[in-house]
UniProtKB/Swiss-Prot annotation:
Its EC number is 3.6.4.13. GO terms for cellular component: cytoplasmic stress granule; spliceosomal complex. Signal peptide: none annotated. Coiled coil: none annotated. ATP-binding RNA helicase involved in translation initiation. Remodels RNA in response to ADP and ATP concentrations by facilitating disruption, but also formation of RNA duplexes. Residues 1-15, 73-87 have a biased composition (Low complexity). ATP binds at A230, Q231, T232, G233, S234, G235, K236, T237. This is ATP-dependent RNA helicase ded1. It comes from Botryotinia fuckeliana (strain B05.10) (Noble rot fungus). Keywords: ATP-binding, Cytoplasm, Helicase, Hydrolase, Initiation factor, Nucleotide-binding, Protein biosynthesis, RNA-binding. The lineage of its organism: Eukaryota, Fungi, Dikarya, Ascomycota, Pezizomycotina.
Length: 683
């Protein structure tokens, strides 16, 4: 039994205790001791069995390593610079590398400090960012990878270049009204633009300013407020980004307010100097991408915040610096309530697609942001409004937000571009799918954007097209932000060349190289039609628009005819016949309700033309006149009321309001027949 259990020296009968030997080590314990460290191993770290020290002498002076002599490395003797491993000696401290600590809370450049959220303009932030140092703008190093990401390569099909038809824009009429309007610029030059911005503009392959840019650049650089109307796709984004960034490069960051510092001189609150508000997530993302492009290698740090995305990542982005903020109104109000954004430093406020923001019900949030928070007053900031249309109610809103502004109208505002070939076809609802298939087979090449009215129809139509072997995707409000971004990206790069969309994608989105827009369902508002077809024919390029029309769309029939006439397009005979059939409904867009009144000066400066506008059954009406006459609803109109020649006190209509409106200055109620100028009002 003992022999069986001996197992290489494990003797159960021996009196001397033996340690347990694991099975995988048995038979290996009787060999010679290791001779030292392997050839490629550090000998000083090799400690075989023994007294616990390495293969060297025991340290002199006792058992403690504290008494051992200083270690001397092999080779070149003692290191230079003393007993340390820095061969070049201790580094000298460069205070300019970290900004001026006294300039504001958090340090660098007075713009937020290292880790602060105010901008951190005094330090290089990495990724090719520049600095603001000693009152000068120092551009960061070039980064080839970032340049390819932002600007693409020459002739990149995913980056739309300026089209050849911008040369025709010199013939488009431009109206600039206001006091002392500056002369337009004809080239991207210094002055007025900063040299660094001009380099980024060249990287983006922009050759000449668009008409709206020719006028907006000197107006904004001159310190004036601006209300600008221009054809969609005419470069409105550059119209406000170019002057804002150019002045930022020249003047540097604003110091964070003295009361902003938290514990240890840091603040997690962002203090942007420029705020750009836009109605949709896609539009703010697009503006943010453009701002990154033109702020490349500069001290300006753009940020974007919008709903439907992870707020944590947006907060972390702001903490790395936030000088130019692009936001949707809802998410901005949320971040203000959380105490993460302050508007104290705002120098520039931009409202892009302002009419769309009011249509979507954002007016309370906009008024709170502009008037109810800590934003500087109208006299202490520059305010810019940009849109393709400016109905009268928006112009009245501008009266509260803008000061001594210049009204800029480029081309036929509220109309479409002649670069777009518009076709209107009579198609009953039951036949729309088959006609759409014929169109897609005929115009197969290029990107096609199809607009529908409902979210359900967007999904249904995209599924139908996929079943017909057409690569299609859809975008609408019920899809998550990630799904919407993925659908747009697949459409942009051509993997899904057919995109079915609701109005969420219609306004302001710059999708390059869209060749064909199909209005599968016509909108009820002609402005929406303008913005939909404006997704093609952008940046001076050409495009095709096809609209499916039937008697269910007769509410926009007259406005559609007027639009086609303005753009020198062919007018189908069935449109004129249907327009004659519906003869009794007068006035502006929207039929019975009158809407905004296309003849009421949606493209004119209301300060020059006063009230008026279409409304109701042959009504005159309008949205009031100059500030002294009150607000909305002045004028004659109403059901059967006589047309009002202007808003300067016309006789009240049968049901119309006599004056004022919304508690306006000279009395009168919004449609209150008993208030002919007295103090009564329903408001």
């Amino acid at each position: 039994m003992a022999d069986q259990l001996n197992m290489n020296g494990l003797n159960l009968n021996g009196g001397e205790p033996r340690s347990y030997i694991p099975p995988h080590m048995r038979g290996k314990m009787g060999g010679p001791a290791p001779a030292g460290p392997p050839a490629n191993l550090n000998g000083s770290a090799w400690a075989p069995q023994g007294n616990g020290y390495a293969n060297g002498p025991r340290p002199a002076g006792g058992d403690s390593w504290a008494n051992a002599p200083d270690f001397t490395p092999r080779g070149n003797g003692a290191p230079r610079g003393g007993n340390n491993w820095n061969p070049s000696g201790p580094p000298s401290f460069n205070k300019n590398a970290y900004g001026n600590p006294a300039a504001g809370a958090g340090g660098p450049g007075g713009a937020g400090g290292a880790g602060g959220a105010g901008g951190g303009a005094g330090q290089a932030r990495g990724g090719g960012d520049g600095q603001w140092r000693d009152g000068k703008h120092i551009a960061g190093p070039a980064n080839a990878r970032v340049e390819r990401e932002l600007f693409g390569i020459a002739d990149d099909p995913t980056k739309q270049q300026t089209g050849i038809n911008f040369e025709k824009y010199d013939d488009i009429p431009v109206e600039a009204s206001g006091q002392d309007v500056p002369e337009p610029v004809l080239k991207f030059t210094n002055p007025p633009l900063d040299d660094h911005l001009i380099k980024n503009i060249e990287l983006a392959h922009y050759k000449v300013p668009t008409p709206v840019q020719k006028y907006s650049i000197p107006i904004v650089m001159g310190g004036r407020d601006l209300m600008a109307c221009a054809q969609t796709g005419s470069g409105k984004t550059g119209g406000f980004l170019f002057p804002i960034l150019s002045q930022a490069f020249q003047t540097g960051p604003s110091p964070v307010p003295a009361n902003a510092a938290g514990s240890f001189g840091r603040t997690r609150k962002a203090y942007p100097t420029s705020l750009i508000l836009a109605p949709t997530r896609e539009l703010v993302s697009q503006i943010y991408d453009e701002s990154r492009k033109f702020a490349y290698r500069s001290w300006v740090r753009p940020c974007v915040v919008y709903g439907g995305a992870d707020i944590g990542s947006q907060l972390r982005q702001m903490e790395r610096g936030c000088d130019l903020l692009v936001a949707t109104p809802g998410r901005l109000v949320d971040l203000i309530e959380r105490g993460r954004i302050s508007l104290q430093n705002i120098k520039y406020l931009v409202l892009d697609e302002a009419d769309r923001m009011l249509d979507m019900g954002f007016e309370p949030q906009i008024r709170r942001i502009v008037e109810g928070e800590d934003m500087p007053g109208v006299q202490n900031r520059q305010t810019l409004m940009f849109s393709a249309t400016f109905p009268r109610d928006i112009q009245m809103l501008a009266r509260d937000f803008l000061k001594d502004y210049v009204f800029l109208s480029v081309g036929r505002v509220g109309s479409t571009s002649e670069n777009i070939t518009q076709k209107v076809e009579y198609v009953e609802d039951i036949d729309k799918r088959s006609v759409l298939l014929d169109i897609l087979h005929t115009h197969g090449a290029g990107l096609t954007l199809i607009f529908v009215e409902t979210k359900r129809m967007a999904d249904s139509l995209s599924d139908f097209l996929i079943n017909q072997n057409f690569p299609a995707t859809s975008i609408h409000g019920d899809r998550t932000q990630r799904e919407r971004e993925r659908a747009l990206e697949m459409f942009r790069n051509g993997r899904c060349p057919i995109l079915v969309a609701t109005a969420v994608a219609a306004r302001g989105l710059d999708i390059p190289n869209v060749k064909h827009v199909v209005n599968y369902d016509l909108p009820t508002d002609i402005d929406d039609y303008v913005h939909r077809i404006g997704r093609t024919g952008r940046a001076g390029n050409t495009g095709i628009s096809t609209a499916f029309f039937n008697r269910g769309n007769r509410g926009v029939c007259r406005d559609l005819i007027e639009l086609l006439k303005e753009a020198n397009q062919e007018i189908p005979s069935f449109l004129e016949n249907i327009a004659r059939e519906g003869g009794g409904f007068g006035g502006g867009r929207g039929g019975r309700s009158g809407g905004r009144g296309r003849g009421g000066g949606a493209n004119r400066d209301f300060r020059k033309f006063g009230g008026g506008g279409g409304g109701g059954f042959n009504g005159g009406g309008g949205f009031g006149g100059p500030p002294a006459s009150g607000g909305y609803g002045g004028g004659g109109g109403g059901f059967g009321g006589p047309p009002a020649p202007s808003s300067y006190g016309p006789p009240p209509g049968q049901y119309g309001g006599g004056g004022g409106g919304y508690g306006g200055g000279n009395g009168g109620g919004y449609g209150n027949p008993s208030a002919g100028g007295g103090g009564q009002s329903w408001w």
